[in-house]
Amino acid sequence: MEKKTIVLGVIGSDCHAVGNKILDHSFTAAGFNVVNIGVLSPQEDFINAAIETKADAILVSSLYGQGEIDCKGLRQKCDEAGLEGILLYVGGNIVVGKQHWPDVEKRFKDMGYDRVYAPGTPPEVGIADLKEDLNIK
């Protein structure tokens, strides 16, 4: 079976590179073709990389607490760019302060994200979810 391609990056003005490298290594080891666009990435970079590589999913990371601002509108931009239905995952420290997680998760799902991960979620959880969502046995 052909490897599934994912675009991975850290959105907005966030420069947290260590978690990005861990995710890159973990998803690569799990058999995915990872296109890592790095840190400080605007939404357009995720979209352009997904189009260029015919990606199956976009994985957005944010650790500096501003993810809610940075992630708003990405689903709509994906749809406008012809990426309707592409899987969108987001995770990390995606909001400012301690907030009730079910509320945070709902807000991101309402923005069009398929999966939303709390701080400290192990990469293996996202890998298992992605395999399920892409029907990989």
UniProtKB/Swiss-Prot annotation:
Family classification: Belongs to the methylaspartate mutase GlmS subunit family.
Involved pathway(s): Amino-acid degradation; L-glutamate degradation via mesaconate pathway; acetate and pyruvate from L-glutamate: step 1/4
Function: Catalyzes the carbon skeleton rearrangement of L-glutamate to L-threo-3-methylaspartate ((2S,3S)-3-methylaspartate).
UniProt catalytic activity: (2S,3S)-3-methyl-L-aspartate = L-glutamate
Top EC class for this record: isomerase
Subunit: Heterotetramer composed of 2 epsilon subunits (GlmE) and 2 sigma subunits (GlmS). GlmE exists as a homodimer and GlmS as a monomer.
Cofactors, names only: adenosylcob(III)alamin
EC number: 5.4.99.1
Gene Ontology molecular function: any one: metal ion binding
Residues that hold adenosylcob(III)alamin according to the record: 13-17, 61-63, 93-97
PROSITE patterns: B12_BINDING
Domain B12-binding: 3-137
GO BP, one annotated term: glutamate catabolic process via L-citramalate
NCBIfam families for this protein: MthylAspMutase (TIGR01501), PRK02261.1 (NF002612)
SUPFAM superfamilies from the UniProt entry: Cobalamin (vitamin B12)-binding domain
Keywords, in A-Z order: Cobalamin, Cobalt, Isomerase, Metal-binding
Gene that specifies this protein: glmS
A Pfam short name: B12-binding
Organism: Clostridium tetani (strain Massachusetts / E88)
Gene3D superfamilies noted in UniProt: Cobalamin-binding domain
InterPro entries cross-referenced by the UniProt entry: Cobalamin-bd, Cobalamin-bd_sf, GlmS
Protein's recorded name: Glutamate mutase sigma subunit
